[in-house]
């Protein structure tokens, strides 16, 4: 099983990329949106290997969180790798997580191969199970200051670890993220809002 591959992106097509590893092997990695990668650039691509009866395929992801969301989708009855990639293709992880948490079946049915029954199954299987990914996939606006952004990310992870839901954390993140602060300061501000 592979976790990631470091190498040179040598080819980009509408459905996959080819990455040449340093050992000289070229891997075909199916991707939700291959054009997010740059051709002829050394890249660190997260990989998921799927073994089927007559097929072994590799799927490539821009980061570990996208890979984790892909794997969560694969656990839903009726969702295979191609459907999971189609769902991830628009790059709106925030919208996907929000739709699952808010039972928005209409949003989920907009994806190819996802009908009403499958959308309901996605909500049933994943609701409440995406909390860890919520703060990592863009549900919180990033600051232009990297130190402030890291402090905010650390604070939000701490709140999730304390048992607050992703929905609550997202709500307070929009408020506390407006000001520059330390991790401790963000946590204190968030707790004041959450305890009310």
From Swiss-Prot:
Enumerate the residue ranges of region (Domain II): 63-141
Species this protein is from: Leuconostoc mesenteroides subsp. mesenteroides (strain ATCC 8293 / DSM 20343 / BCRC 11652 / CCM 1803 / JCM 6124 / NCDO 523 / NBRC 100496 / NCIMB 8023 / NCTC 12954 / NRRL B-1118 / 37Y)
Its Gene Ontology biological processes? DNA recombination; DNA repair
Key word DNA-binding present: yes
Could you tell me which residues belong to the region Domain III? 148-196
Region annotated Flexible linker sits at: 142-148
Family label: Belongs to the RuvA family.
Chain's role? The RuvA-RuvB-RuvC complex processes Holliday junction (HJ) DNA during genetic recombination and DNA repair, while the RuvA-RuvB complex plays an important role in the rescue of blocked DNA replication forks via replication fork reversal (RFR). RuvA specifically binds to HJ cruciform DNA, conferring on it an open structure. The RuvB hexamer acts as an ATP-dependent pump, pulling dsDNA into and through the RuvAB complex. HJ branch migration allows RuvC to scan DNA until it finds its consensus sequence, where it cleaves and resolves the cruciform DNA.
Copy the domain comment: Has three domains with a flexible linker between the domains II and III and assumes an 'L' shape. Domain III is highly mobile and contacts RuvB.
How would you summarize the oligomeric state and partners of this protein? Homotetramer. Forms an RuvA(8)-RuvB(12)-Holliday junction (HJ) complex. HJ DNA is sandwiched between 2 RuvA tetramers; dsDNA enters through RuvA and exits via RuvB. An RuvB hexamer assembles on each DNA strand where it exits the tetramer. Each RuvB hexamer is contacted by two RuvA subunits (via domain III) on 2 adjacent RuvB subunits; this complex drives branch migration. In the full resolvosome a probable DNA-RuvA(4)-RuvB(12)-RuvC(2) complex forms which resolves the HJ.
One GO CC term, this protein: Holliday junction resolvase complex
Name of the protein in its database record: Holliday junction branch migration complex subunit RuvA
Q: Which SMART domains match?
A: HhH1
Q: Which molecular function GO terms apply here?
A: ATP binding; four-way junction DNA binding; four-way junction helicase activity
The record's gene field reads ruvA
Q: Name the SUPFAM superfamilies for this protein.
A: DNA helicase RuvA subunit, C-terminal domain (SSF46929), Nucleic acid-binding proteins (SSF50249), RuvA domain 2-like (SSF47781)
- Disulfide bridge partners, by residue number: none
């Amino acid at each position: 099983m592979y976790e990631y591959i470091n190498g040179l992106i040598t080819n980009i097509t509408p459905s996959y990329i080819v990455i040449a590893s340093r050992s000289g092997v070229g891997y075909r990695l199916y991707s939700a949106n291959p054009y997010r990668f740059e051709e002829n650039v050394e890249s660190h691509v997260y990989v998921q290997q799927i073994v089927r009866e007559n097929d072994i395929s590799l799927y490539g992801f821009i980061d570990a969180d996208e890979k984790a969301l892909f794997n969560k989708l694969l656990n839903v009855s009726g969702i295979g790798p191609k459907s999971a990639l189609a769902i991830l293709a628009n790059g709106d992880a925030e919208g996907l997580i929000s739709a699952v948490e808010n039972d928005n079946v209409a949003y989920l049915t907009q994806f190819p191969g996802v009908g009403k029954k499958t959308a309901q199954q996605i909500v049933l299987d994943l609701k409440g199970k995406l909390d860890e990914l919520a703060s990592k996939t863009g549900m919180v606006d990033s600051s232009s200051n990297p130190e402030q952004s890291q402090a905010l990310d650390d604070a939000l992870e701490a709140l999730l670890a304390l048992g607050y839901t992703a929905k609550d954390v997202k709500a307070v993140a929009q408020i506390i993220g407006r000001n520059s602060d330390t991790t401790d300061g963000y946590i204190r501000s968030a707790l004041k809002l959450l305890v009310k």
